[in-house]
Amino acid sequence: MRTTLLWLRNDLLLHDHWPLQCALDKSDQLLLVYCLPDIWFQSTTYGFPKINNIRLEFLLQSLEDLRKHAQERGGELIFRRGNPPEIVAELAERHRVDVVFAHREHAPDEKREEDNLRKRLKVPLRLCDGNSLLKETELPFSLVDLPQVFSNFRKQVEKEVQISRPIPVPKILPPH
């Protein structure tokens, strides 16, 4: 029996979710995990928290909505607050997870989290692209040749790229 863990971060939905699809393709059991980072409640160098009350309320409503939709499909959302790499690694070990999936992030803090998690995990971490309309591999040019002006980018992309259809919402989520 293969168990996967899907680490949710900025992708609190079930539709058009590439890491979820990859996890479903490779698992008999699935853990959906969201970790609310403690660091978000600390002040930045500018003296304000990374998350304000309005954003936190919206995030919690989004998580509740995700929990409801996961339960309707037989899944369960695990919610924790703390250090995400520590929590994900601990859950992966406790539940004997074979692989962890997540969306690839590009911001420096999130990249550090990914590196930290990789060091802690005893299983592979599979990061999937999918937070943008196009994957890097679908571009008609290399990133080195990325047009500096948006209209040039748009013209090349419109001419040469076929936009993928969204991934449908899974009908069933495996239990954990």
Model-derived regions: residue spans:
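Substrate/cofactor-recognition hotspot
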Residues: S164-H176
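Trp/Phe/Arg-rich N-terminal binding region typifying the photolyase-homology
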Residues: M1-R165
